[in-house]
């Protein structure tokens, strides 16, 4: 339940409650379909109907997963994850995912290698051992994603102390359509993987 605790928003955001107070059991479904057994005291339950949308938050995502109600019987709701392509296009500046394994990123002008903490088609968060960049600096970022080499400019938005080093946030500058598509596909893939992990953790 830990990955599901942050919150559950209904389609109109008329009510907000912690997921642990709403869901009795989280059951794995087929592919991107899940069965939620809701607490009958859940305030949004009477308002959820077939075709409605609601959102479920996972710790690894900065944006909720959008779900569509397929069936509803008493306190059970069968829902399907909506196309992540639609989600990242609508909110692509904000939907970030954490890599499942370390991804090194080379900052050319500083001759420094960092590690990607999170990524979206809008930018990346990078772990650095030393504070080598300042806000508003534009640098060249080079990294590999799913076997594809990416080289693009990034503007540093902030640098803050983080663990035993620093976290720097970069906004991509003039990202090409090709690179945007590569990153977008990766983000969607990771969202699907995270949703699967989230379901499996509740079995």
From Swiss-Prot:
Domain of life: Bacteria
GO molecular function terms listed in the Swiss-Prot or TrEMBL record: cyclic-di-GMP binding
Protein family membership: To A.aeolicus aq_820 and aq_1583.
The protein's name in its UniProt record: Uncharacterized protein aq_1211
Alphabetized SUPFAM superfamilies for the sequence: PilZ domain-like
Residue ranges occupied by any PilZ domain in the UniProt entry: 90-188
Lineage: Bacteria, Pseudomonadati, Aquificota, Aquificia, Aquificales
């Amino acid at each position: 339940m830990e990955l599901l605790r942050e919150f559950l928003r209904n389609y109109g955001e008329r009510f907000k409650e912690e997921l642990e107070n709403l869901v009795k059991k989280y059951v794995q479904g087929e592919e991107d379909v899940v069965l939620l057994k809701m607490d009958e005291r859940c305030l949004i339950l009477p308002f959820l109907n077939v075709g409605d949308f609601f959102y479920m938050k996972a710790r690894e995502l900065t944006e909720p997963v959008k779900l569509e109600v397929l069936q509803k019987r008493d306190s059970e709701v069968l829902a399907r994850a909506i196309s992540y392509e639609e989600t990242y296009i609508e909110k692509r500046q904000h939907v970030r995912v954490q890599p499942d394994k370390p991804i090194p990123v080379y900052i050319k002008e500083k001759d420094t290698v960092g590690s990607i903490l999170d990524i979206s088609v809008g930018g990346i968060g990078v772990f650095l051992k030393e504070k080598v960049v300042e806000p508003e600096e534009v640098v060249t970022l080079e990294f590999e994603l799913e076997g594809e080499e990416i080289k693009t400019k990034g503007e540093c938005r902030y640098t803050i102390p983080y663990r035993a080093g620093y976290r720097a946030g970069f906004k991509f500058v003039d990202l090409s359509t090709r690179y945007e598509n590569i990153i977008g596909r990766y983000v969607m893939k990771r969202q699907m993987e995270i949703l699967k992990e989230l379901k499996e953790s509740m079995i």
